[in-house]
């Protein structure tokens, strides 16, 4: 889990537009966040395995 202070800091408006960055909406992780889902790779994988993301299924080939 991310620090509460860093999550609060990311919610405030940035001084410059280049300072804005994405965070996972579920856990607050700043790295490896998918823009389409607003989730980090770990949370996305977890929800996909549980079947909570419509249209997403495990790949097999």
From Swiss-Prot:
Signal peptide: none annotated. Its cofactor is Zn(2+). Keywords: Metal-binding, Ribonucleoprotein, Ribosomal protein, RNA-binding, rRNA-binding, Zinc. The keyword Cell division does not apply. The keyword Cytoplasm does not apply. GO terms for molecular function: rRNA binding; structural constituent of ribosome; zinc ion binding. One of its GO terms (cellular component) is small ribosomal subunit. Zn(2+) binds at residues 24, 27, 40, 43. Binds 1 zinc ion per subunit. It holds the Pfam family Ribosomal_S14. GO terms for biological process: translation. Part of the 30S ribosomal subunit. Contacts proteins S3 and S10. Binds 16S rRNA, required for the assembly of 30S particles and may also be responsible for determining the conformation of the 16S rRNA at the A site. Belongs to the universal ribosomal protein uS14 family. Zinc-binding uS14 subfamily. PANTHER family: 30S RIBOSOMAL PROTEIN S14, SMALL RIBOSOMAL SUBUNIT PROTEIN US14B. This is Small ribosomal subunit protein uS14. It comes from Limosilactobacillus fermentum (strain NBRC 3956 / LMG 18251).
